[in-house]
Amino acid sequence: MKRIAFVFSTAPHGTTAGREGLDALLATSALTDDLAVFFIADGVFQLLPGQKPDAVLARDYIATFKLLGLYDIEQCWICAASLRERGLDPQTPFVVEATPLEADALRRELANYDVILRF
C-alpha cells in the first residue's frame, strides 16, 4: 500500500476543507496504517483548543482531532516556521500532540510519502 500524507494548510471554519480532510483522514486510517498528518501555514490553527465555531454557525469538528490516537494515527507534524509566523508557541497545548519541524525537515519528511492530500 502506498504511504499517504494528509496536509492541513487552511484555517478552520472558513471553509469545509478542514472538516473534510479530517473525515478523509479517519476513513483512510481504516484502510492503512502507513499515513501521517502535517499541519502547515494556516493549518496550524486547526489544532488550537478553545475555538468557538458556533459563533460563525460552523460545526465544532476540532475536538475530533483528539481521536487520532484511537485510530492509531501517531505521525503528526507541525511546521515550526508557520507557528512562529502566526505568533504561536510550539509549547501550546494543542488538541493533538504534533511534533514541530522546521520547514526543510518537514519537506524531507513529506517527501517520504507516495500520495499527498492537501486540505
Swiss-Prot record:
GO biological process, one term: tRNA processing
SUPFAM superfamilies: DsrEFH-like
A Pfam family recorded for this sequence: DsrE
Primary subcellular site in the record, as a coarse category: cytoplasm
GO cellular component, one term: cytoplasm
tRNA processing is among the record's keywords: yes
Family: Belongs to the DsrF/TusC family.
Protein name: Protein TusC
Organism whose genome encodes this protein: Escherichia coli O81 (strain ED1a)
Organism classification: Bacteria, Pseudomonadati, Pseudomonadota, Gammaproteobacteria, Enterobacterales
